[in-house]
Swiss-Prot record:
SUPFAM superfamilies from the UniProt entry: Alkaline phosphatase-like
Coiled coil regions in record: none
Name of the protein in its database record: 2,3-bisphosphoglycerate-independent phosphoglycerate mutase
Family per similarity comment: Belongs to the BPG-independent phosphoglycerate mutase family. A-PGAM subfamily.
Pathway(s) of this molecule: Carbohydrate degradation; glycolysis; pyruvate from D-glyceraldehyde 3-phosphate: step 3/5
Annotated keywords: Glycolysis, Isomerase
Function: Catalyzes the interconversion of 2-phosphoglycerate and 3-phosphoglycerate.
GO MF, one annotated term: metal ion binding
Origin species: Methanosarcina barkeri (strain Fusaro / DSM 804)
Reactions accelerated catalytically: (2R)-2-phosphoglycerate = (2R)-3-phosphoglycerate
Biological process terms in GO annotation: glycolytic process
């Protein structure tokens, strides 16, 4: 049996008036996911355990079969693993966003989805100006970077994700708690370094949002994972543009497949991801394919972009993998779901359970669902499932 786990990050949503009261999944044209729902079984998955933040780190860890209540130590350590940054036992890793601040408010948590090339220059400048024996900056992808603090500095600091406070005054959300003042001052110092940087002056001339500040959040120390193969007796691989997902794969001992042109946005290389998934399943039992675009569109509050992202995920990821599964000599199981909702109305993550559908090429019994969406999933035979149990259920099913 081969397994494909296909994640459309943030696809789930709430009913939208401009769509006639439909959710994004209900309004989008998604024939491949609808086929899986009609010819497989559907239900709702609780991806965010009680008491943990509604983040892609927690949700995707759950979907990959790792209970966050046991394994979760923060978002940034996972991203550090993907970037090849080794953490000492007393290191604290922070996600370090490049953001746009205007009139004392966060205008854009992504600094206009700044290019990785521009961002690298800015992060290297910050490391030269603000880095020292206890602080180091590491460049990542687009607006997503890393700050490493020594001697457990910031381990108990209270931080807020920037995508949760778009349009809000930063003074109300600067780091707080133990050592909060230190990291608040660091953010303010970054503004001085970045404001007149040539990269930002050029971006302003081009009508783009400048990356005129950092924002730190999501900190934690290195987690300890049981290898995926030891847990489930299956070999696996991860395909994603996002360091967070790659880092989960690294800690799980899975292959992390790099796909050229995978950006984590609407312009990602969908075909490259689908082809890589099909190829890796020649030698591995399971592939986990993650697409970030629907989540980014949700954070932007763009109905049109989110519809396009979901339809592209369906036609350019799900459809080719489904076609391959149906024509393969080996039996296939496909699991498709979002990791969490990123509703247009709130522009951030929600904790609600998400729809999921499972299709097996060697089974004919199904729920005969009319479509893959939130409402259909409520009527599914699989009911409400703890997401961290899903992989175990799939690989043990007869």
């Amino acid at each position: 049996m081969k397994y494909a786990v296909l994640i459309g990050d943030g696809m789930a949503d709430y009913p939208i008036d401009k769509l006639g009261g439909k959710t994004i999944l209900q309004a989008a044209q998604t024939p491949a996911m609808d086929y899986i729902a009609a010819h497989g079984k559907i239900g709702l998955a609780k991806t965010i355990p009680d008491g943990l933040p509604a983040g892609s780190d927690v949700a995707n860890m759950s979907i990959l079969g790792y209970d966050p209540a046991v394994y979760y130590s923060g978002r940034a350590p996972l991203e550090a693993a993907s970037m090849g940054v080794a953490l000492a036992s007393d290191d604290v890793a922070f996600r370090c966003n490049l953001v746009t601040i205007e009139h004392g408010r966060i205008k854009d948590y992504s600094a206009g989805h700044i290019s990785s090339e521009e961002a690298r220059i800015l992060i290297e400048t910050l490391d030269a100006e603000l880095g020292n024996e206890e602080l180091s900056f590491y460049p990542g992808i687009s607006y997503r970077h890393l700050l490493i603090a020594k001697d457990n500095l910031g381990a108990e600091t209270e931080c807020t994700p920037p995508h949760d406070i778009t349009g809000k005054k930063i003074e109300e959300y600067l780091p707080g708690g133990k050592e909060g003042d230190f990291f608040s001052d660091l953010i303010k110092k970054s503004m001085i370094v970045l404001e007149l940087h040539p990269v930002n002056l050029r971006r302003i001339e081009e009508g783009k949002n400048p990356a005129n500040s950092i924002w730190v959040w999501g900190q934690g120390s290195a987690p300890k994972f049981t290898p995926f193969r030891e847990l489930y007796e299956k070999t696996g691989a991860v395909i994603s543009a996002v360091d967070l997902l790659k880092g989960i794969g690294v800690y799980a001992g899975m292959d992390v497949i790099e796909v050229q042109g995978a950006t984590g946005y609407l312009d990602t290389n969908y075909e490259g991801k689908a082809s890589a998934a099909i190829e890796v399943l020649k030698t591995r039992d399971l592939v986990f394919v993650h697409v970030e675009a629907p989540d980014e569109a949700g954070h932007e509050g763009s109905i049109d972009k989110k519809l396009k992202a979901v339809e592209d995920f369906d036609s350019r990821i799900v459809a080719p993998i489904l076609k391959h599964a149906k024509t393969s000599d080996e039996p296939f199981t496909i699991l498709v779901l979002p990791d969490h909702p990123t509703p247009i109305s709130i522009k951030t993550h929600a904790r609600d359970p998400v729809p999921f559908a499972v299709y097996r090429t060697d089974k004919t019994d199904s729920d005969s669902a009319e479509a893959f969406d939130e409402e259909s999933a409520k009527k599914g035979s699989l009911g409400l499932v703890k997401a961290s149990d899903l992989i175990g259920i799939l690989v043990k099913a007869k």
